Amino acid sequence: MKLDDYQKTIVYVLYKEDNHTEELPIHDGAVRWLKQNMVITETTNQYMVSDLNNAVFPFMLNPWVVDAMQNDEELVNEFEKAYKKMESKYNKMISNRY
């Protein structure tokens, strides 16, 4: 399965959480793709949302993903590299606005 840098960033952020869980935007295509490919799953069936246009929902990494990352340091490094690349890109975008 081939992931782009944004999808790798989402997976890396979830992996770094102690419980591998985080709120993610439900209208995001990358989140939807990761869910449909069983990389992530929702942690509940119902969740209070205050802004339907920017709704978030708690997702977690599926256990097979956690196992794969715990047993493959190169994979973790690859995802961390994608995370840092996306973080740098985001920071440049923000700094150019102001």
How would you label these PLM feature ranges?
Residues 25-47:
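Basic amphipathic alpha-helical segments that dock to polyanions
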Residues 19-24, 40, 58-59:
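Generic preference for hydrophobic/aromatic residues in regular secondary structure cores
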Residues 4-5, 18, 28, 42, ...:
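Acidic-enriched, low-complexity/disordered segments with a strong bias for Aspartate over Glutamate
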Residues 6, 12-15, 47, 83, ...:
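Sequence-level detector for tyrosine residue identity
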Residues 51-98:
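Short, amphipathic alpha-helical interaction segments positioned at domain boundaries
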